[in-house]
Amino acid sequence: MASELAMSGSDLPTSPLAMEYVNDFDLMKFEVKKEPVETDRIISQCGRLIAGGSLSSTPMSTPCSSVPPSPSFSAPSPGSGTDQKTHLEDYYWMTGYPQQLNPEALGFSPEDAVEALINSSHHPLPGAFDGYARGQQLAAAAGGSVPAEEMGSAAAVVSAVIAAAAAQGGAPHYHHHHHHPHHGGGGGGGGHPHGAAPGSAPPSSASSSAAGSGGGGGGGGGGAGGLHHPHHGGGGGGGGLHFDDRFSDEQLVTMSVRELNRQLRGVSKEEVIRLKQKRRTLKNRGYAQSCRFKRVQQRHVLESEKNQLLQQVEHLKQEISRLVRERDAYKEKYEKLVSNGFRENGSSSDNPSSPEFFM
């Protein structure tokens, strides 16, 4: 590799930053026809702007949803007229987005690149400038900073866009490239991870709320699929089943405490407390209903017994009145018999003169 690059002579810069990029990438395997310098710079700027955004699996879903052709991926020849600035800008472009290096699969025109560069000011992507930031860090670690004339016009455009993004959406903060899967996808399809491709940083919460639209399924739909924060996943694929639907009221009441505790293993403490309070409320409600039913039933029984006793009292009263009438009849008959017998026998001293004698 060093012998191949030595052929170019003084075409390559000798700064530590440029040599670092030369050692990292094999430039001889990219055989792409050279394009004009102005178009190269515009396309490289657009490539850096869209490097950290959400990329879909379809190449041409949006004007800047895919990577434009590399400006100069062929090794510099001694007779080429390109200067050192162009090569340094190409290195910035390569580190910003290394995951798609096949420029022939995409037909990206300079007009699309200019339009994407203009639209990038309306949709700031703070995570799109990792390559530029890494370049600055490497330059500082090497013991010197790259002058402004070596960085070229593309770096100035990148700095201006970074300032515009910071003014519109606050200071951009960068996340580590941890692939947090979403907890709730569109149809339980595995969730669209934050890191859409290696080398692209996930957007901040402010940019994700602005650009995160569309359902992020397993294959990635449009240009902005599944950008929401992973901890705010919706209720998909059966993971957030509410326990009110799992246990009916009758099951909660009739289930034993041991069985309920076995069913609630792995459930949060708040959910367990809420379910047990609901079970206690249902039990108290059932106990109150049973007591109310028993009271009503006992009242009906007592009322029926009272009616029976009243009927018996009426019957006894009727019996008493009948017996009184019979007594009066017998008494009257007796008095008649006593008066008739006294007249027949006459009055004598042996016979008593009063009817009490015969009694």
Swiss-Prot record:
PROSITE patterns referenced in this protein's UniProt entry, alphabetically: BZIP
Alphabetized Pfam families for the sequence: bZIP_Maf (PF03131), Maf_N (PF08383)
Listed InterPro entries: bZIP, bZIP_Maf, bZIP_sf, Maf_TF_N, TF_DNA-bd_sf, Transcription_factor_Maf_fam
GO MF annotation terms: DNA-binding transcription activator activity, RNA polymerase II-specific; DNA-binding transcription factor activity, RNA polymerase II-specific; identical protein binding; RNA polymerase II cis-regulatory region sequence-specific DNA binding
One GO BP: gene expression
Domain called bZIP: residue spans: 274-337
Cellular compartments annotated: Nucleus
Region: Disordered, residue numbers: 57-85, 169-243, 340-359
Alphabetized UniProt keyword annotations: Activator, DNA-binding, Nucleus, Repressor, Transcription, Transcription regulation
Positions of region (Leucine-zipper): 302-323
SMART domains (UniProt xref): BRLZ
Biased composition (Low complexity): 194-211
Extent of Basic residues compositional bias: 173-183
Gene3D superfamilies: 1.20.5.170
Tissues expressing this chain: Expressed in kidney, brain, lung, gut, mesenterium, testis and ovary.
GO CC terms: cytoplasm; nucleus; RNA polymerase II transcription regulator complex
Composition bias type Polar residues, residue spans: 345-359
Segments passing through the bilayer: none
Entry comment, domain topic: The basic region and the leucine zipper structure are necessary for association with HOXD12 and PRRX1.
Subunit (UniProt): Homodimer or heterodimer. Binds DNA as a homodimer or a heterodimer. Interacts with HOXD12, PAX6 and PRRX1; interaction is direct and inhibits its DNA-binding and transactivating activity.
Family that this chain belongs to: Belongs to the bZIP family. Maf subfamily.
Primary role: Acts as a transcriptional activator or repressor. Positively regulates the expression of alpha A crystallin genes during lens fiber cell differentiation. Binds to Maf recognition elements (MARE).
Protein name, as recorded: Transcription factor Maf
